[in-house]
């Protein structure tokens, strides 16, 4: 049993998003808290304070992680510390180049949200999204 330090943490690489999903504060541009990108130096400080107890790191909450230009650097940093990493994305920023960089970063798990099998259904959830681009 472990006391005092979390072994799982969920962080938000950014509050920004390229889509306008109706159920999300990021998509609605309706945050009631500070917004922006997680700074790499703050991220490293957080990991150093958590020490070697952290086992599982979720890079996601209410923004598109790939918008943060330092996202994959942070994943790589956590990976080198032996931390299991996971993220969720809308998939619009994935291309051959950053797909390769994502693999090389050591990201352990990626969830690509696809909410529908036709453009009409998909865009009812993922406003301004392009299903063809994601698939």
Regions found by a protein language model. Give the residues of each.
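Conserved alpha-helical substructure of the radical SAM core
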Residues: 1-109, 120, 124-125, 129-132
